[in-house]
């Protein structure tokens, strides 16, 4: 009997511990709708995407204003190189370790911060000032400034291209999308578009950009090779009206990861409009009603879920709401700053993006 027990023990030792299954979590930074605390309070809320988006925990963060109150969260991004998640507020940039869940550093920057982006290799951050004149290029490990790019465009939203060679910069006061070559910081532009650009997205091959514009219930398409606007799309069957935030009818746009559809936010009508991207053109195919006015939208990496800022989690295939984000008190959670992270045990191994980007190319599969 002793020999049998020893043999079983030895077999377990040499076999090792069975590998942990990859688990999908949604990280939600709050306050993620202006500085309103009624939509989830303050902190980093974690939801289990493999278990009907059930609330898991709340991680304490920083990001307080000069009066000691939680400041507006402006962006969220992940670096697997540093194993950290980054949260920008109007005043500062925070770096939190995803494994220890402790604040590594928080830095305030002159002229504030807005929605930043982390390079695919996780080593560099492009950080806009708060609706200001410039973007700062940072070392992701330390937050130290490496370079500054001045556009005078009302710096606002930032998106790294999937190959790491280009970064896309959107300013609130410009009809052009600025494109930066990361090798030498040279700048080009795509546009002009219908009006000042708001949220946008790109395909995986970085051939097309899809942009919201001020005063447009719809979107426009830009050719990133020629630098020209090539298509204008209006929402059919709906009229714009007063919106609670952002001042434009459509503030939120995303590509499905397979790049077959565009999903578009409609604030006044509390809806998402879906458009098919076909060889013969762009075709409006449906509308999904939401619980509130959407101000942002992204997708899960695998394309299974559409995730608007309203907290209504949508099955991307059936176009039905399948879950609603709720915190530990049962309160409805909303945020425009969310990102998916995959864990192998306690280790982060893959991250999504706050932007709903195309993933059909080899870089993002």
Predicted regions and their residues:
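Positively charged n-region of N-terminal signal peptides that target proteins for export
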Residues: 1-4
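Bacterial N-terminal signal peptides
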Residues: 6-15
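Predominantly soluble domains enriched in secretory-pathway, periplasmic, or organellar proteins
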Residues: 16-365
């Amino acid at each position: 009997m002793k020999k049998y027990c020893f043999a079983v023990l030895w077999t377990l030792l040499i076999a090792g511990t069975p590998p942990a299954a990859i688990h999908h979590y949604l990280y939600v930074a709050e306050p993620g709708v202006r500085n309103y605390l009624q939509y989830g309070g303050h902190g980093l809320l974690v939801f289990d995407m493999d278990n009907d988006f059930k609330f898991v925990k709340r991680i304490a963060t920083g990001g307080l204003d000069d009066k000691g109150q939680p400041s507006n969260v402006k962006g969220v991004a992940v670096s697997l190189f540093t194993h950290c998640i980054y949260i920008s507020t109007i005043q500062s940039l925070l770096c939190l370790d995803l494994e220890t869940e402790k604040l590594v550093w928080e830095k305030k920057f002159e002229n504030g911060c807005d929605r930043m982006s982390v390079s695919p290799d996780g080593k560099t951050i492009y950080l806009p000032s708060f609706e200001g004149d410039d973007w700062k290029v940072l070392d992701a490990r330390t937050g130290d400034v490496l370079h500054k790019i001045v556009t005078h465009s009302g710096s606002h939203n930032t998106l790294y291209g999937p190959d790491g060679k280009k970064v896309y910069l959107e300013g609130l006061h410009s009809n052009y999308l600025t494109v930066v070559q990361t090798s030498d910081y040279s700048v080009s532009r795509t546009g002009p578009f219908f009006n000042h650009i708001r949220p946008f997205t790109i395909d995986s091959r970085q051939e097309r950009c899809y942009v919201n514009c001020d005063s447009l219930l719809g979107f426009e398409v830009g050719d990133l090779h020629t630098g020209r606007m090539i298509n204008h799309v209006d929402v059919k069957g709906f009229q714009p009206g007063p919106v609670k935030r952002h001042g434009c009818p459509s503030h939120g746009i995303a590509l499905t990861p397979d790049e077959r559809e565009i999903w578009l936010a409609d604030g006044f009508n509390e809806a998402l409009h879906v458009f098919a991207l076909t060889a013969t053109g762009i075709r409006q195919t449906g509308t999904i009603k939401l619980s509130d006015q959407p101000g942002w939208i992204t997708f899960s990496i695998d394309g299974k879920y559409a995730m608007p800022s309203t907290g209504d989690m949508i099955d991307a295939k059936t176009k039905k709401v399948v879950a609603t984000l709720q915190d530990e008190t049962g309160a409805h959670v909303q945020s425009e700053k969310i990102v998916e992270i995959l864990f192998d045990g306690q280790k982060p191994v893959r991250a999504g993006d706050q932007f709903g980007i195309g993933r059909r190319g080899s870089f993002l599969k």
